[in-house]
Amino acid sequence: MTIIEELGKKAKQASYDLLGLSTIEKNQMLTQLAKDLIEKSDFIIDENQKDLQKAEENGISEVMVDRLKLTAERIKGISEGVLQVAELEDPIGQVIKGYTNLDGLKIVQKRVPLGVIAMIFESRPNVSVDAFSLAFKTNNAIILRGGRDALHSNMALVQVIRETLIRLGHNPDAVQLLEDPSHDLAEALMSATEYVDVLIPRGGAKLIQTVKEKAKVPVIETGVGNVHIYVDATADLEMAKSIVINAKTQRPSVCNAAESLIIHEEVAENFIPLLEDAIEAVHKVEFRVDDKGYSLFKHAVKATENDYATEFLDYILSVKIVSSLDEAISWINRYTSHHSEAIVTRDIQAAERFQEEIDAAAVYVNASTRFTDGFVFGLGAEIGISTQKMHARGPMGLEALTSSKYYINGNGQIRE
C-alpha cells in the first residue's frame, strides 16, 4: 500500500465517522482546540524556529520569512479564528429547498459534506489550522500537504489538532499531514480519485498551474493575486495615496496585496510625486513603470511585459498610465488573475462600470484590496480565495465546503 493510499483510506473512513457528529460536538472540539493552541504555543514556536532557521540559511527573502513566521500573537490570532468558526452557523443539514411534486413525493434538498478534501499549500503554516477548522465544522476529513519550508511548523500544528481529536473521542484521521513534501507524492495525491473528493491548491502561480495540468481529482482553483488598483481621473488623490500604500506595503506577501497600479494620465503628474514621497516613509518600494510614466518618478525602473503579469509578493509595484476608463478596464481584464481589483474615483458611473465589467471575484470602489479575506467578510477562517466561477468564487467559508443531496420520501409511488 502506498503512502497516498494509506492516507486516502484513513481519510475516507474518517469522513464517514464525521457524518454522525452534531453541531454541539463539533463546536466543543473547536473550542478545545483553540485553547490547546494557546497552551502549546511554546512547542509550536520552537518547531517553527527550525523552519525559520532553515529559511534564513537558504537565503529566503524577508517577506517570505514573514509568511512563515509564527509568534505568540499570531498563534493567538489563529486560535481566535478557530473560535470564530465554532461560533458560525452550521450549514450541514440546512434545507436549501423542499417541495411535494405532482406524484406526491416529498423532495428536500439539504447541505451535506463534500467528504474528503485534499489541500496543497505553500509557506503559511496557519493554513493547516484554518483548513482543518472549516473542514471539521462541515464534517469533512482533510489531507494536508504543505511546503517543505514549513514542514516542522505544520507537523507541530497537526500534532496538536490530532491530540485534541483523540482526547475528545474523535477519529484523529479527520486531519492528516503528508509529511513527505516530494513532488511525486503531491502528484499522486492529485490523482487519488478513489479517495479525494476535491483538491484545493493554495499558493503561487507555479503551484496552481501544476495542479491544473496534472490533477485528476476535481479542483477548486484559488488565490494567485495579480491585484490592480486604478486611480481614475476624478479620484481623491489623498484617498488614492492611502489606499495604494496600504494595499502594497501593509503585508506584501499575501494574495490580496496590490501588485500593479494603473493611473489615469490626467492625474499622473500630481499623483505620482505625492505617492512616491509618502510610500518612501513607510517602506522602500521598487516601481516598474511604462515609458509614459517613467519620467514622472524620481526612482523607477522600466517595466517589462512580464512585470504586468507577475504576482511579486514583495515590495515591488508595476505602474501603467492610461488615457481612459475603457483602457484601464481592458488592461486589467487582460492581466487579472480574477482575484481582487479596485478603482479610486468620485465618478459614480465610472465606479459602477468598473464593478460590472472587471472579471474578478472581488471588485472594490474606494477601498483597499487587503479586505478580501474570509474573516473580514464574516465567513470565519477561509480555506482559500477561489478565482474560478464554478462551485465557489471569492473567499471560501463553510458553505463552499458543502455539496447538496436530495432526500425523497414517498408512500409506495411507482413511475408509470
Swiss-Prot record:
It holds the Pfam family Aldedh. It comes from the Bacteria. GO terms for biological process: L-proline biosynthetic process. Keywords: Amino-acid biosynthesis, Cytoplasm, NADP, Oxidoreductase, Proline biosynthesis. The keyword Ubl conjugation does not apply. Pathway: Amino-acid biosynthesis; L-proline biosynthesis; L-glutamate 5-semialdehyde from L-glutamate: step 2/2. Catalyzes the NADPH-dependent reduction of L-glutamate 5-phosphate into L-glutamate 5-semialdehyde and phosphate. The product spontaneously undergoes cyclization to form 1-pyrroline-5-carboxylate. Its EC number is 1.2.1.41. It catalyses: L-glutamate 5-semialdehyde + phosphate + NADP(+) = L-glutamyl 5-phosphate + NADPH + H(+). The keyword Cytoplasm applies. Belongs to the gamma-glutamyl phosphate reductase family. GO terms for cellular component: cytoplasm. This is Gamma-glutamyl phosphate reductase. GO terms for molecular function: glutamate-5-semialdehyde dehydrogenase activity; NADP binding. It is found in: Cytoplasm.
